[in-house]
Amino acid sequence: SNIVISGSSAGAITVMQAEYELCNRTSWAEVLPKDFRYAGVMSFSGAILSRKGEVKYASAPAPTLMLHGTADNLVNYKQIKFFNLGFFGGGKLVKRFEKFGYNYNMYHFIGYGHEIAGSMDTTLDLQLDFIETNVIEGKRRIVEAWVDDPNVYKGVGVQSRKELYSK
């Protein structure tokens, strides 16, 4: 297909989870044709929920762009695990992508929290480059960058859990 799925925060969790379920042909993916594949996945502060321990793909995921703040505690940058139940953020997922040679671009935003979920407009160049090179041209271009830029979007409406849930 020519479909690139993209999401931010809960939407990023949704697109990452959708691709994970599809690659593993779980019951959640049964509604799609057997040969269906996404052309690409773009995640702004996303994660994957696994009920079986470490994230494992039965087939390689579509080219994936991940952007995540290293200090994100709302959608955890690394992981949260309880026995076999785990919630794996971009900082942990990229290690799996690297280990298995998947096609990905990962931008770690040093010291940033969940505000990276709202960075779609300020990271447009990264997105277009990924779509052009990894998706349209089909090149396996791996990028892993640590971004330390005070000019990255720190928009309104991005709150911590404490700010969201305190009275």
What are these model-derived regions, one by one?
Residues 50-53, 74-76, 116-117:
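Extracytoplasmic/secreted cell-surface and envelope-processing proteins
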